[in-house]
Structures are given as structure tokens and as C-alpha cells.
Amino acid sequence: MSISSSQEKDELARIQESTDYAVTRAENGFIMGHFFNCSLSSVFQPVFDAKTRSVAGHAAYIRSVVSEENPLSPWKVLSLGEGDAPLVRFDRLCRAVHVLNYFSGRSHEGNLSVTVQPRLLESVKDDHGRAFKSILDIIGVETSRVVIEIPAEVNRNWKLLKHVISNYRSHGYRIAINHNDAGDDWVAELASLYPLYPDVVRLEASVLQRLGDAGPLVDVIHRFGAQVLFREIETARQLTGAVRAGADLLQGRFLGIPAQAIEFDLFIPAATTEYRSAEASSRRIRTLQHYIDAARI
């Protein structure tokens, strides 16, 4: 992926001038954030479109080190401060680092998925996403190219979840939530989000084995207008099962590991997706009725 050096410098300089985020460029050209005595950078895992078998975007993850000999977990960094203020600052810095590394000076149409800490969603009472939008505005990226992944912990408070979705969507972000494998209650609660349904619902690939046939659940999620992403795909069997179930998006180490390289010239072999249409068509007839009933508003 070609990078315009002058454009990258301009965008980094604008962030440095407009915010107090400690961001610098490493020797390899990647942007680094600095939090206490830790250096933070990004890795990106490809997310595939199950229909085209090509890369649709990437999920961003933070990596941090104190020194080359002493790796430090990003979550350990949070213990360096007390209260929510350091967490808010850390979380926002991570997302700034991600978007600079993913979008700055790069010409591609991929979407970027970023996570948000549960405590941040609780501590920031209103207007979630406004501070992040200001960073995107500085580097000229539309919020519609960013998917906000809301952690599964927030599913325990559906009132908060609905409030958070409303705030982020008002700024134009796409929203992804996590399925927590709670059966019919989860489907009914998903229905209760009306009209604030998520854009993407993330399912663990392990659900394929637990349910036997995840197709009916995928069908119900589609009825809410959401795409289904199967994540943590570790085997060829899980990949095949996800495609047969009707997945829209696919992610996991079997398809690509998180790395600094942002690659788009990757493809899933056609053999894994060839039965998608026939399987989905036949399943429409046998979708579980109790799922359908739970989905009705």
C-alpha cells in the first residue's frame, strides 16, 4: 500500500497541533502513541467479505511495550492510573493511533473496526464518539468508515447499550455488538433496541459447535437488518460452518493474524463459499419458529 510521505506528515502534524495526544512516528513509518512509560502501536487483522471472499476491512488492536525486552499488556497499562480519567485518555489515544496508522496517506476503501472500553462507555455520560469524530475530521475520514465494536459486557445493561448506539450513530459511525449466546432472551433484547439495531452482530465461531446449526440465528439477525460477522475462526471446519450458516463477514487467525501490514490482496479459496446460496435458500423453510416469534416487534 503506497503512502504519501508529505500527506502523512501533514496529518500527523495536524493531530499534534490540535490535540495534546503524545503521538510520534517510528522508524518503520508507523505512528506510536505514548502513555506513561509505554509505547503504543497498532496491529490489524483482516475482515473478509464472505460473498466476494476479499478483504472488506480490518479490526484494530493495540500493542504496547516498555522496552524491547519487556512487553506489557495494554490492560496492565490501565493499572498505572487511578479512576476513569486515565482510562478515557488511554482509550482515546489508542483509537487516534489506529486511525492514523490505517488511514493516513493510504488509498483504500476498507473499513476500520475499533473497540471501546466498557468503563469508558459508563464514565462518558453523553455524546459518545464526539471526541473521536474530531480526530477523524482532522485527517479527513468519514465516520461511516469506522465500526465501533461495543463490548459484550455492555449487554448486561441494554438501556446503556441503546443509549450508546444512539450517541455513536448520531455521529455517523457504524455499530457492532457481540452476541452473548443467551438464547431467546438475547433475541428478544435485540428486538428491544428498535429502531437502533446494530449494523453488525459479532458471533464467536465456537457457537457453530454449540448450536449445531447456527443458520436460524443468523437468519433472525438478518431480519433486523444487521450483518453477521463470525470471529475467532481458527479452523477450516469453522470457516466452512460460518459460510454455510450465512455469514456476511469472517475474521480469525485461520484467515489472517493481526499484523502491522495492512493487506487487501488476500482472498478466501472459492471452495469454502460455493454452497452458500443453496444452503441459505433451503434454510429459509426451516428457520426455528420461536426465533421468529422473538424477533417480532
Where does each model-flagged region fall?
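EAL-family c-di-GMP phosphodiesterase catalytic domain
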Residues: 1-34, 39, 153, 194-297
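Catalytic core of bacterial cyclic-dinucleotide metallophosphodiesterases
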Residues: 2-15, 52-90, 108-120, 142-152, ...
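Catalytic core of bacterial c-di-GMP phosphodiesterases, primarily the EAL and HD-GYP domains
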Residues: 90-160
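Short acidic, S/G/P-rich loop/turn micro-motifs used as interaction or catalytic elements
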Residues: 119-123, 153-157, 181-184, 206-210, ...
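Short beta-strand/loop segments at the ligand-binding rim of alpha/beta enzyme cores
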Residues: 164-179, 217-230
